[in-house]
């Protein structure tokens, strides 16, 4: 018969009798699939399934689940882990020249899970072709996954992000580029900002203080920005060309200018 979560937690043994540490990664998937999971976690926390002290770590990539659903069911400390900054990425790739790390950081950012997939023994081009431009690559569908993990209407959000990535970064520009109503765009941008995908910044390049106050939008998530700048607008050709041909045609020539932004 199928073992319940309560039975499973009750069978856990600790190598150190002073404390049991239970770490569950991407816990939101289990919780959404089976309501009894969080009930069992609560019982474990209250020492009903294990006699000694217990430290429970529920890791998740879902902001909504962490701040709303989990917070309602599970009272405890919260910690948001930020991406690595540039200096931390330099230390991660200590064998590589800084110029190469600038390229890596400019393409995939400081997300540890992305960096762990990067093969420092291979060139920047080889890694992008292998991870990003190959359908079986680890980061091929990652930009869509980042968006759809928290938001519906992937197509609409993708249209807006593609507009911003090509420089249509003011509300009026996005309106003309997408054909969506200004009200709809404002709601979508607010949602994207809530999940740290897009941010609004003040820019004096727009001319005058009044325009500066209105600000411009830019994609905050480094890899999402890279994807919508280079890959998404040319997806039809990605199906026709080899990853190497696609890289040479659509990425290589504009990469340095992109990294200087």
PLM region spans:
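Short coil/turn helix-boundary motifs
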Residues: 15-16, 48, 96, 167
């Amino acid at each position: 018969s199928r073992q319940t979560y309560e039975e499973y937690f009750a069978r856990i043994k600790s190598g150190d009798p002073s404390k049991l540490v239970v770490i569950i990664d991407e816990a939101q998937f289990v919780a959404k699939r089976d309501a009894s999971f969080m009930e069992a976690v609560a019982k474990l926390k209250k020492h009903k399934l294990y006699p000694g002290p217990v430290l429970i770590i529920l890791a998740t990539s879902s902001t909504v689940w962490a701040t709303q659903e989990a917070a309602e069911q599970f009272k405890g400390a919260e910690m948001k882990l930020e991406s690595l900054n540039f200096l931390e990425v330099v230390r991660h790739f200590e064998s590589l020249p800084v110029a190469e790390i600038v390229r890596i950081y400019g393409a995939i950012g400081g997300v540890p899970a992305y960096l762990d997939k990067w093969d420092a023994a291979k060139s920047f081009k080889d890694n992008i072709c292998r991870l990003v431009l190959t359908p079986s690559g680890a980061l091929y569908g990652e930009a869509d996954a980042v968006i759809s993990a928290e938001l519906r209407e992937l197509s609409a959000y993708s249209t807006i992000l593609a507009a911003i990535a090509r420089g249509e970064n003011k509300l009026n520009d996005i309106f003309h580029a997408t054909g969506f109503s200004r009200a709809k765009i404002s709601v979508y941008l607010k949602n994207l900002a809530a999940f740290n995908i897009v941010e609004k910044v003040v820019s004096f390049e727009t001319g005058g203080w009044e325009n500066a106050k209105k600000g411009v939008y830019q994609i905050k998530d480094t890899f999402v920005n890279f994807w919508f700048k280079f890959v998404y607008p040319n997806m039809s050709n990605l199906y026709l060309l080899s990853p190497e041909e696609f890289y040479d045609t659509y990425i290589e020539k504009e990469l340095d200018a992109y990294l200087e932004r």
